Amino acid sequence: MIIRTEKLQVGYGNKPVVTDINLDLLAGQFVGLLGPNGSGKSTILKTIIRLLAPLGGDVYLGDVKLHQLSNHDMAKTTAVVLTDPIMPGLLNVYDIVMLGRHPHTGFTGKPADDDHQKVLAALEMVNASNLKTRYFTELSDGEKQKVLLARALAQEPKLIVLDEPTSHLDARHRIEVLLILRQLTQGKGVTVVASLHDIDLAMKACDVVILVKDEHILACGTPEDMLTDNLVAELYTMEQATFSNKLGGVELRSQQGNGLIFVVAGSSSGSSLYRALAKHRFSIVTGILSESEIDFNVAQAIGAKIISVPPYDYIKAEITAEALRLIEGAAVVIDAGFPIGTLNRPNIELINYALKKGLVVGTLRDRSEAAKLYGNQAGKMHHYQDYFELISAVRKIYQ
């Protein structure tokens, strides 16, 4: 056990922010704190590292109460990377990382050869050896974060606490930082506790997530168990977006406004199209989908009306009839370019029906493929080269 809390209350002055915190965090775990802004994630972290005194309860580092540890022992066991920018003046990267060796340098504070070796090893581990002679102030945000991680590594801690370590970083540096943290937990047995805002990254990187809301811990456990659609909706109170555990991310919900579009899709052909239409506030009906495929999950997450069948089931006549009825309520029908197999052949019937009814039918297929599938009817179709062209054309129809 690295960190244990018993009936912990954290806050400022006499005002509690989060109460009744009871946690048991193990060696080698990557622990993520998730919650809305102002929920108390940073307050919990600042209490764990003694920047704030607990308002009640206890924090244990190993078997020792936190307040019983000397500053020297605390520095040997715990490294901290906060969001507050540091202003190191003319210190270069090597000097910054060497600061992490200070708890190990003895009375004189003079680094030994072993300390220099560990600084170089820390820089290499975060892929920042090429930065060692540069001034810290010259670095990009992503490079600075890697250097601060190297400083934390140089301390050789059992626990690293980070406040929003991926904020202000581009996609590449976010992934790089999280992979470094994963390497620390798995390779060196270091416990990492970090506040995070990216639900999808927390789901993929963390061993444990702690959900914080309304002055209490809403849930704590593995992200696979805790980051369910319902719990994330409760945590963030999202009305115009939906988190999907199956997709591992957030989808914008389709909003009624610009008109109703029927999308004939399947086998992942519709997913990007659904997102594009939802972004432009079109109402979406889609089918006929198998409930085991990604198109079904994306359509469900964005709030589209779905005509579907169970996995690997044939499309029955009554399901086709329902889809045909809904097509009549749409001014535009889109063929997403779905592949044709034995189970989904009735979807071709949907497109032919829309063409016979004189509806506007668009397709993302090339003309030769459309002609093979729909025969002479294909001449009535509007062909779009990409999503931009499709969305532009559909918006003109509803103007």
Where are each of the predicted segments found?
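Helix-to-loop junction immediately C-terminal to a conserved catalytic motif
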Residues: 49
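Conserved catalytic motifs of ABC-family nucleotide-binding domains
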Residues: 156
